[in-house]
Every structure is written in C-alpha cells, then in structure tokens.
Amino acid sequence: NDPECFISRIYEERNYPVKIFTIVCSISFSAAISTTTIIQRGAMICALIDAIEYAGHRAEVICNWAVSREQTSYYRQGNLKNYGWLEVDVTIKKADQPLEMIELAFCLAHPSMLRRIMFSIAEIEGWSDFAHAYGYPATATTKGDIYIQEVFSGEVSDDRAIDWVLEELEKLGVDLSTT
C-alpha cells in the first residue's frame, strides 16, 4: 500500500557544480505549540529540502534539540551552558544519501520525534530529573548554512509558507527555473 515503492528515480549527470547545504533544524518546541503547527512547519522544511535536491544540489539535514534549564533568553542562547543545558544533534540525512521523504517527514514534522524520541534521551541522561518540564527551547550551538530555529508561535498561512521556502532558496542561491 505504499505508492513510493512504484517510483523509480532516474539520476542524471549535470555539468554544473553541486553545492552541499547543511540544514540544522531545531525541533525544540514550547509546550504551548500545537501538533498542527509542528506538522505544518515540518512540511515547509521538507518542501525546502526537496526543492534543494530537485535543483541538483545536496542537503545534509541535522535535527537539533537544545534546551536550557532556565527560561530567560540569556540562558536559552547558550551563554551559561554549565548551569543547565542539554543539546542533541541527530543527522537524519547525509549529503550523499538519497532523499527519503518518509524518514525526513517523521523527523521534522511528527510531534513524536520530540515527545517520544528526544524526551526519552532526556530521561536516559537524567535531564528530566534536573530540569522542569524537560527545560525551555534553546538556540543550537551549530547552525549550518541554514538554521531553522525553535518555535514559540503558531501556524502561518499557506501563502506565507510558500514564500518562506522561496525566500530561503533565494538566500542560498538555488534557482529552480534552470532545472
């Protein structure tokens, strides 16, 4: 029942230099963020990565979960990491791997990636006993070529989501019209 198994990808050689982009995506969310917002944001990021690869470039994608023990922005920016800081980076797609949208979508758009996977890491590391409510969303240490920061607000319109993808592609110098 998986239509993706019927797709065969044909790779073609291109005569222009391929760029490799490192995308660091924070999956730190405030407890007030709805699952709908997480899913929409993940879909936007998946669309961006798909467009980069469609244009003939490569993407390395890293999920980042950074949390601070304290709520103030000073601590959430990583200024006093020895006071209470947990950060986990998971490479979910290496640049030389083909794009597997199902795996990418789970890691970037499914609330369980944070709530089950990352929270279980926090429990194993003892962080959940140290910080209240698993801590507060914080800024990643390593930001790559694109850093998609933690979320504190709600949904955006579909038009705004499309504009965001196009703006990010433009910042990277990725032109879809030549592909």
Regions found by a protein language model. Give the residues of each.
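Acidic, glycine-rich A-domain
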Residues: 29-35, 43, 50-179
